[in-house]
Amino acid sequence: MRFIITVLLIFFIHTVQAAPVLKATISRESQVIGNDGVTHTSVFQEHMYRDQNNVWFERVLPKHHQHSTNAKNKPSHKHLDLSETAQHYFLDNKKSTRLNLVLPEDKTVIHLQTVDIEMLGLTNCWTCVFSIFDSRSVKKMKITQQGNGYTWYESQNAKNKIKVKWDNKNNLALIIDILSLNGQSYSLTKTHIQQVNITPPWTQYGKFISKEYADFGD
């Protein structure tokens, strides 16, 4: 029954899409200087695919990346590694945000509930994933520069100074530059749009094994 529901759900997702699919590469860099004087730096990339009702993120991993294995040298995701999963956000027929984690290597899809999303530190904010930065927040920011198809926004709160370069046509953030006022941390996100009108990856897991996040517990 769960398999049938999954197939029907994926079919619904595919049939409602109308807009072209957007593909982009997102580069994320962050740095934090701890109170102990140690600097922690994180740099990674993701591929993003998007249409009006679906957003898909997948981490760019090294070519020789080894998936988790058990004693018999077979893939094992008993303890889920989020870096190995693709994140498929989509709007259901009630326009509520849903999230599936997809393990292409294992041909498995994990259906997350709201409590699972919160526990994993993920988001269920549709505008945040669709536009990479919450478009509702952008509207409250000060415009500092306008160019050919883009707008620079800026704001400051008690902790951070935030600059956003916004793609007006595609409704997403091209650059997100966040610098703490005390100079101890920053994060920089850059989005490079590569192409449109491609085959979306979420059309390819309708026959995958369906699981719940609880299936990965101890």
Predicted segments with their positions:
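N-terminal cleavable signal peptides for secretion/export
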Residues: 17-54, 60-62, 211-218
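N-terminal signal peptide c-region/cleavage motif recognized by signal peptidases
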Residues: 13-15
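An acidic-aromatic
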Residues: 41, 46-126
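Short, exposed beta-strand/loop patches in secreted or surface proteins that constitute
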Residues: 45-50, 89-92, 139-146, 164-166
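Non-transmembrane domains of secretory- and envelope-associated proteins
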Residues: 19-21, 144-150, 157-162, 169-218
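Short, hydrophobic/aromatic-rich segments at coil-to-beta transitions
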Residues: 18-27, 52-58, 76, 97-98, ...
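Positively charged n-region of N-terminal signal peptides that target proteins for export
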Residues: 1-4
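Flexible, surface-exposed loop/linker segments and immediately adjacent secondary-structure boundaries
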Residues: 114-146
